[in-house]
UniProtKB/Swiss-Prot annotation:
It comes from the Eukaryota. Optimum pH is 6.5. Residues 730-885 are annotated as: C-LIP. This is Phosphatidate phosphatase PAH2. Belongs to the lipin family. A motif (DXDXT motif) lies at residues 734-738. Transmembrane segments: none annotated. Residues 409-419 have a biased composition (Low complexity). One of its GO terms (molecular function) is phosphatidate phosphatase activity. Residues 422-440 have a biased composition (Basic and acidic residues). One of its GO terms (biological process) is galactolipid biosynthetic process.
């Protein structure tokens, strides 16, 4: 019974040791910090793990608090989905200067150290978007030779229709704008279901939509980008930045190809003009051809037919398509008719006399040497009749500043000829057009200024308001989903009273309304966030949480930290005026966090003048997490935000421009200086400044990592930080089989309270420590065994002599990878060599810190020789406790070695040269000459 009781007590003590305060699948490895000759600090990696099941937690709950010697460190770590902790660090990446093509994400474990820049660009590749349409252009994803679009705003509006479909030529409508050849044309979408039998639609506001599309049969094959409609899917080849050429010829097909013989054909009425009691239906036949060279030809044939006076009325008009030219924008629109309810065309609505003859025989506009990028310009062509539309449903009315001088029915005549002006990059080119003087027709250019739209805060965010410069005339609507739609589609209606057609192509680089990608990228993120402060200055809260806040920690984590130390009226009254002297005081103004010294002038301005606009957001704690390039993709959640596109093009897309791009933009790109871009990377080591702020003492320091969740509560892992000088000498010792008697039993026997250590090991290592050497205990065990291993070494005593303290450096891998490497592959030296070389990198290059090594295997000798330990200082012990030096010295034990410590390990303060001391020069055999 006594034997059974003793076994039970051993098991109880072992279980109690295993189920201690540490996480069973987590742990932390001891850290080595080396002070450099210049006073800076270098640190070994901070390997901290809490277990992979933590990956189910949200991003806002991954904050790890660090306490060093019982004092908060002032900075935090973050928990990855793998359960491993990491630091966030901002680095400057100069675009255009990287020649290696590597993006270094300072991580380890299951994550790769480096990733190719091309792979990163592929992951965050963003298709170029139209700047004047409120819909998501799908992000292409290739699968089985088809392009599968990412569901975006169109999927939301059109009821989430599938974007994958077989090659079916029964396409009702085809979207030829925003993503067509990536030409950045403005697209106005009418999402109403159209049937072939429909001849007219009432103008009740629901039909008030614009479309730049075709309704014929279409079947386009090849690699393409999808545009989704309520009834159809169009796949258009991805050809970036072609040259445009507009020609008036007798062509009656709409052809779009890149060496693919597929086309859409359309012939129909494009406009209705009411004048002097007679109605003229102006039809437009057009064709677009894309050649392999990157040129796109648009052939336009205008037709005008006289109609009876009672044949057309204002209510029979299908829709009125109005597009005004905004800075850096180009749009093309037409005036639709009742005869062609299912057609949206690209053309010009022309107004002439009752003779019905075409007003233009030929109108040729050629645009060459034109670099088209995201948001560079929009095409604008406005056409209207004299009928003013009155939508029946409630709409958002937009005010345009240039409509005051517009008079209904006004028609001014110019000379016998007019010219269309094309202005690109500050250059103007004129192409004479042949017009008939008696027709009294002119081509004019109308300007519209940016539209400022005031919206409620609960509908549009501040970022949307900042991006609003100029808006298209557009509407997104689906009759099938109108009743279930949670928000009313955006629309506008007004009569600009333009009686003539216009085509204006401009690139106004100096326009303040343009949304240039570089200008947006260069704008201060703090200034963007501060706009919300200005809009909501009345929201002011106090909290003593400055020590918990850090830049880039995330808005949700910052909110939780703020609320945990938030002050209420009672706390504020109890603290009194002394609260202003508290360094932890943080003021939350309009959702932004300020320390008191930065918030004081803002609050003073709000109280005194009722506004915070007079102050800059200086000193604000930028808690918002910096987005990665992959995060700027517009999410397919069906959001109704005004600008769902990214304004920043990826580097790979810019480099992938075809031959259609001209030499001038390429020269500008080559001459442009590299721009430094800040990005956040993961790191396993803190900065030298952060290490200096810890105020470490020489030798051992305790560190605690704390992670809290509502599900599992507070978890904590402990480790130790050792601060050494740059000229320290290190003695490395293996654990399993070297300090213990065997590899396997040495791990389990101490768990049940049985001493399984080598005789005399504590006395030997203590004597080595007393001579000024630092000890490292190296083991290939898993990180989850860190606490057990550390506790075993601390509790190991022989004849009242304990082991000296030293960092326990073990494998950062999990339990099974470590066991597989050590037991199955029998290659623990792979980890040991990498670990020792990493520690050696903490010291100056001219100083080798490793002095001697103890092990029990030949692989240990290989590891020690690899890092520069001489053979005479490598001690290999066998299971019998016999120590061999260089395999040729008399066999000794740890006890016998203790008597030779002063000769084998002379005091570090001695000035005797290492290569010629009494042990290395006289006791070791001479090297072999063979």
């Amino acid at each position: 019974m006594n034997a059974v009781g003793r076994i039970g007590s051993y098991i109880y003590r072992g279980v109690g040791t295993v189920s201690g305060p540490f996480h069973p699948f987590g742990g932390a490895i001891d850290i080595i910090v080396v002070e450099q000759p210049d006073g800076t600090f270098k640190s070994s990696p901070w390997y901290v793990r809490f277990g992979k099941f933590q990956g189910v937690l949200k991003n806002g709950r991954n904050l790890i608090r660090i306490d060093v010697n019982g004092v908060d460190s002032g900075f935090n770590m973050y928990l990855a989905h793998t359960g491993q902790a990491y630091f966030l660090r901002e680095v400057e990446d100069v675009v255009g200067e990287s020649e290696s093509g590597e993006v270094y994400t300072l991580s380890s474990g299951d994550e790769a150290e480096t990733t190719s820049r091309d792979d990163v660009v592929d992951k965050v590749k963003i298709p170029l978007k139209s700047r004047s349409c409120n819909y998501d252009s799908p992000s292409p994803r290739t699968g089985n030779g088809k392009i599968v679009g990412k569901p975006g705003i169109l999927g939301y509006v059109f009821g989430g229709r599938s974007v994958r479909e077989s090659q079916d030529c029964g396409v009702e409508r085809a979207e030829i704008a925003a993503d067509l050849l990536e030409v950045k044309w403005s697209t106005n979408i009418d999402t109403r279901k159209r049937g072939k039998g429909m001849s007219s639609e009432s103008l009740d506001g629901k039909d008030y939509g614009e479309s730049t599309s075709t309704s014929g049969k279409s079947c386009v094959e090849g690699s393409s980008e999808m545009l989704v409609d309520s009834d159809s899917i169009l796949e258009t080849p991805l050809v970036a930045s072609p040259t445009l050429r507009f020609l008036d010829e007798k062509e009656q097909d709409f052809r779009e190809s890149t060496n693919v013989e597929d086309y859409c054909e359309e012939d129909g009425s494009s406009g209705v003009v009411v004048e002097n009691g007679l109605c003229e239906a102006s039809s437009m036949v057009f064709s677009v051809t894309s050649e392999g060279s990157g040129n796109v030809e648009i052939f336009v044939e205008p037709r005008t037919e006289a109609l009876a006076e009672d044949a057309v009325s204002g209510s029979d008009l299908d829709s009125k398509q109005e597009l005004l030219r905004a800075p850096e924008s180009v749009e093309i629109a037409t005036l639709g008719s009742a005869d062609q309810a299912d057609m949206g065309s690209i053309g010009t609505s022309q107004e002439g006399s009752s003779t019905g003859s075409p007003v233009q025989d030929e109108n040729k506009i050629t645009i060459k040497d034109m670099h088209i990028s995201a948001g560079d310009f929009e095409k604008s062509q406005s056409a209207s009749g004299e009928s003013i539309l009155q939508p029946e449903i409630e709409e958002e009315q937009f005010s345009f500043s240039d409509l005051d001088e517009c008079k209904p029915g006004g028609n001014s005549s110019v000379g016998s000829s007019s010219s269309d002006t094309v202005k690109v990059d500050g250059k103007e080119s004129y192409d004479e057009t042949k017009t008939s003087p008696e027709k009294g027709v002119e081509n004019t250019m109308a300007l519209s200024e940016p539209i400022n739209i005031e919206r409620k805060k609960d509908i549009f965010t501040d970022e949307m308001e900042r991006l609003v410069g100029s808006l298209p005339i557009m509407r997104l609507q689906n009759n099938d989903d109108m009743d279930a739609s949670p928000s009313q589609p955006l629309s506008q209606s007004f009569d600009p009273c333009f009686n003539t057609s216009k085509l204006d192509l401009r690139e106004d680089e100096s326009s303040s309304g343009g949304l240039d990608a570089e200008s947006v990228a260069e704008s201060s993120p703090k200034l963007k966030a501060f706009k919300h402060v200005i809009a909501n200055p009345e929201v002011v809260e106090l909290s003593l949480c400055k020590h918990l806040l850090s830049e880039g920690m995330g808005a949700e984590a910052a909110s939780q930290a703020f609320n945990s130390e938030k002050l209420d009226m009672e706390k504020f009254a109890s603290l009194g005026p002394s609260i202003l002297e508290n360094d932890k005081l943080v003021v939350k103004i309009g959702g932004c966090y300020f320390p008191w010294d930065a918030a004081a002038p803002i609050i003073l301005g709000v109280v005194s003048f009722g506004t915070a606009q007079v102050f800059e957001p200086k000193g604000m704690i930028a808690v918002d997490r910096n987005e990665k390039p992959g995060d700027v993709l517009a999410q397919g959640s069906g959001s109704w935000k005004l600008w769902p596109f990214s304004l920043r093009r990826s580097t790979k897309e810019a480099e992938a421009s075809p031959s259609g791009d001209t030499a001038e933009p390429e020269e500008k790109q080559e001459k442009s200086s590299p721009r430094p871009m800040k990005k956040t990377v993961r790191a396993l080591t803190p900065t030298s400044e952060q290490l200096a702020s810890l105020d470490l003492k020489d030798g051992m320091n305790s560190v605690t990592f704390t992670f809290s969740t509502n599900i599992v509560g507070t978890q904590q892992v402990d480790a130790r930080i050792y601060l050494w000088k740059w000229n320290s000498r290190i003695v490395v010792s293996d654990v399993d089989g070297t300090i213990t008697r065997s590899d396997v039993l040495g791990q389990f026997m101490p768990l049940v309270g049985i001493d399984w250590s080598q005789t005399g090991v504590t006395h030997l290592f203590s004597a080595v420590k007393e001579n000024g050497y630092q000890l490292i205990f190296l083991s290939a065990r898993a990180i989850s065994q860190a606490s057990v291993t550390r506790q075993f070494l601390v509790n190991l005593k022989q004849d009242g002599k304990a082991l000296p303290d030293g960092p326990v450096v073990i494998s950062p891998d999990g339990l099974f990878p470590s066991l597989f490497r050590e037991v199955i592959r029998r290659a623990p030296h792979e980890f040991k060599i990498a670990c020792l070389e990493e520690i050696r990198g903490l010291f100056p290059p001219e100083h080798n810190p490793f002095y001697a090594g103890f092990g029990n295997r030949d692989t240990d000798e290989i590891s020690y020789l690899k890092v520069g330990i001489p053979r005479g200082k490598i001690f290999i012990i066998n299971p019998k406790g016999e120590v061999a030096v260089n395999r040729r010295i008399d066999t000794r034990s740890y006890t016998n070695l203790h008597t030779l410590v002063n000769r084998m390990f002379p005091a570090t303060s001695s000035s005797e040269p290492e290569d010629f001391n009494t042990w290395n020069f006289w006791k070791l055999p001479p090297p072999s000459l063979m």
